[in-house]
């Protein structure tokens, strides 16, 4: 069967597809997919349920962590120490004391002969070659 032009091919293919679909014979993948659309709604519902469960689980962990941070006692000595600036002032004082100690530990050794007689020639060691 030969068709003379392409305009007659489209109605021929449409009629052939309708006959095949009505007979329930060998149906293309697109036709099979249209029959299973009801099941795809259940798949989407399953995915949404799983995501919702993990979202709820994550939200619960996050809220319990935030709640535990709020329950810290404000009269706890460690929290009072951190909230105050006393530790910063003490840290500055300790740093300044260490700087002063390092300056005291440094000293210069003078050669008195070189200071008293700067014009005198100092002897040098000669190599033994």
UniProtKB/Swiss-Prot annotation:
Q: Where are the transmembrane segments?
A: 44-66
Task: Give the InterPro entries listed for this entry.
Answer: K_chnl_KCNE, KCNE1
Q: Which UniProt keywords apply?
A: Cell membrane, Glycoprotein, Ion channel, Ion transport, Membrane, Phosphoprotein, Potassium, Potassium channel, Potassium transport, Transmembrane, Transmembrane helix, Transport, Voltage-gated channel
Q: Where in the cell is it found?
A: Cell membrane; Apical cell membrane; Membrane raft
Q: Which residues lie on this side of the membrane: Cytoplasmic?
A: 67-129
Post-translational changes noted in the entry: Phosphorylation inhibits the potassium current.
Modification Phosphoserine occurs at: 102
Superkingdom of this protein's organism: Eukaryota
Which terms under GO biological process does the entry name? cardiac muscle cell contraction; cellular response to cAMP; epithelial cell maturation; heart contraction; membrane repolarization during cardiac muscle cell action potential; membrane repolarization during ventricular cardiac muscle cell action potential; negative regulation of delayed rectifier potassium channel activity; positive regulation of potassium ion transmembrane transport
Statement: the UniProt record of this protein carries the keyword Coiled coil: no
Q: Which residues form a coiled coil?
A: none
What are this entry's molecular-function GO terms?
Answer: delayed rectifier potassium channel activity; potassium channel regulator activity; telethonin binding
Which tissues is this chain's protein expressed in?
A: Restrictively localized in the apical membrane portion of epithelial cells.
Q: Would you tell me the Gene Ontology cellular component terms?
A: apical plasma membrane; cell surface; membrane raft; voltage-gated potassium channel complex
Q: Does the keyword Ion transport apply?
A: yes
Q: How does it assemble?
A: Interacts with KCNB1. Interacts with KCNC2. Associates with KCNH2/HERG. Interacts with KCNQ1; targets the complex KCNQ1-KCNE1 to the membrane raft.
Q: What does this protein do?
A: Ancillary protein that functions as a regulatory subunit of the voltage-gated potassium (Kv) channel complex composed of pore-forming and potassium-conducting alpha subunits and of regulatory beta subunits. KCNE1 beta subunit modulates the gating kinetics and enhances stability of the channel complex. Alters the gating of the delayed rectifier Kv channel containing KCNB1 alpha subunit. Associates with KCNQ1/KVLQT1 alpha subunit to form the slowly activating delayed rectifier cardiac potassium (IKs) channel responsible for ventricular muscle action potential repolarization.
- Membership in a protein family: Belongs to the potassium channel KCNE family.
Q: What is this protein called?
A: Potassium voltage-gated channel subfamily E member 1
Organism of origin: Mus musculus
The gene coding this protein:
Kcne1
């Amino acid at each position: 069967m030969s068709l003379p032009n392409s305009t007659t091919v489209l109605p021929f293919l449409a009629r052939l597809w309708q006959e095949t679909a009505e007979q329930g014979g060998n149906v293309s993948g697109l036709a099979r997919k249209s029959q299973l659309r009801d099941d795809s709604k259940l798949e989407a519902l399953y995915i949404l349920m799983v995501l919702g469960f993990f979202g709820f689980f994550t939200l619960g962990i996050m809220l319990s962590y935030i709640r535990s941070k709020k329950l810290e006692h404000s009269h706890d000595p460690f929290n009072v120490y951190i909230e105050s600036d006393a530790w910063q002032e003490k840290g500055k004082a300790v740093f300044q004391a260490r700087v002063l100690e390092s300056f005291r530990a440094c000293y210069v050794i003078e050669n008195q002969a070189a200071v008293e007689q700067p014009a005198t020639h100092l002897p040098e060691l000669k190599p033994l070659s």
